[in-house]
Design a protein with these regions (language model features):
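Hinge/beta->alpha junction and helix N-cap segments in small-molecule ligand-binding domains
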Residues: 63-76, 94-102, 155-165, 181-225, ...
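Flexible loop/hinge segments that line or gate small-molecule binding clefts
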Residues: 122-162, 243, 269-281
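Short, well-structured alpha-helical segments in soluble
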Residues: 102-116, 220-233
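N-terminal helix-turn-helix/winged-helix DNA-binding helices
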Residues: 37-73
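N-terminal helix-turn-helix DNA-binding module of bacterial transcription factors
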Residues: 1-52
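Flexible loop/turn connectors
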Residues: 224-329
Length: 329
């Protein structure tokens, strides 16, 4: 796509719109672009009557800030996406977007070069980046992030009721001083989980104050923990994710605070660290396979029916009870 744009001295966005049959391109220029694309052997896009499995390439875009050393939640999610794509004969192409690319508003290469028919955008990205991708003309689905102002299909885990369920369990175990661990506003997922925490606490007649919320990450999205802002030690910490819960366990152990004897800790996601840690972390299990499956189904639906109504799918999970929570007498 970038080669076509260079030859005709137009933007890749213009080329993408012309090839996708979208508005904003004159008929004369559209014909030139389509003719040159045919001459250069550009692969045609999927149409309503086409068989998707014949030549469907799907891009998966992840922000570099979410990719940690070794395994992470998003790596597991990506593996399941590849599985579900392979089951229908489609190919998944991964692109990790660097912080510099986000800041400079650089369109991902797989979009610039026209290598994909559609994109699964994993996690939170700046609004301007999302708008830029939308203007490229390539259909995409947002996975693990949602905002009503976004006019794209989306698939998210049930962070709100998931955290509500976790805190309800802590309350049933006799806990009242429960601190939420997560930087509210850092991501849509953390914010949803915070609201679920607030609802459970409010229903129990407990007012949530600022000192009951413990931030867990810095501006680079690295997990950083400190108890300095807590006026009174809680009996339980409800963490926004398992990685934070695991690091909190380590943080507490280093300071001689026992889990669950002195304080209880819960996580969210049911990532592998929640099982391997000592003690095992009580958490909310996100149905990663269902999220991957739904995101693929959503995107294929959009490719086959471009004018279909927007869909926002919430995938439920379940509470996973382990050894990091103790009843308060």
């Amino acid at each position: 796509m970038s080669d076509i744009a260079e030859k005709l001295q137009v933007s890749t966005v213009t080329v993408s719109k012309a090839l996708a049959g979208k508005e904003g391109v004159s008929e004369e220029l559209r014909i030139k672009i389509q003719q040159l694309a045919e001459e250069m052997g550009y692969r045609k896009k999927i149409g309503k009557s086409d068989s998707i499995s014949e030549y469907c390439n799907i891009g998966v875009i992840i922000s570099g800030q979410y990719i940690e050393k070794g395994h992470s939640f998003y790596w597991t999610l990506y593996e399941r996406i590849l599985y579900h794509l392979s089951m229908i004969g489609c190919l998944g192409i991964l692109e990790i977007v660097s912080e510099v690319s986000e800041q400079k508003m650089q369109l991902p290469r797989i979009a610039q070069e026209g290598r994909v028919d559609g994109i699964i955008l994993m996690g939170s990205f700046p609004d301007q980046f999302r708008s830029m991708l939308a203007n490229s003309g390539i259909p995409f689905v947002i996975l693990d992030s949602f905002h009503a102002k976004y006019k794209q299909d989306s698939v998210i885990s049930d962070g709100y009721y998931g955290m509500y369920t976790v805190v309800q369990h802590l309350l049933q175990m006799g806990h009242r001083r429960i601190t939420f661990v997560g930087t509210v506003g850092a991501t849509a997922s953390i914010t949803d989980r915070y609201y679920g925490y607030c609802r459970a606490m409010m229903e129990a007649g407990i007012t949530v104050t600022d000192d009951m919320v413990l931030p867990d990450r810095d501006e680079n999205n690295s997990i950083t923990l400190s108890l300095d802002s807590i006026r009174q030690m809680p009996t339980a910490f409800a963490c926004n994710c398992d990685n934070t819960a695991y690091q909190l366990l380590t943080f507490l152990k280093e300071r001689g605070i026992r889990v669950p004897q002195d304080v209880s800790v819960t996580g969210f996601d049911n990532f592998i660290v929640s099982e391997l840690s000592s003690p095992g972390i009580t958490t909310y299990g996100v149905d990663v396979d269902a999220m991957a499956r739904e995101s693929v189904a959503q995107l294929l639906r959009r490719l086959k029916t471009p004018d279909a109504s927007l869909q926002h799918i919430i995938v439920s999970g379940s509470l996973m009870l382990r050894d990091s929570v103790q009843r308060v007498l």
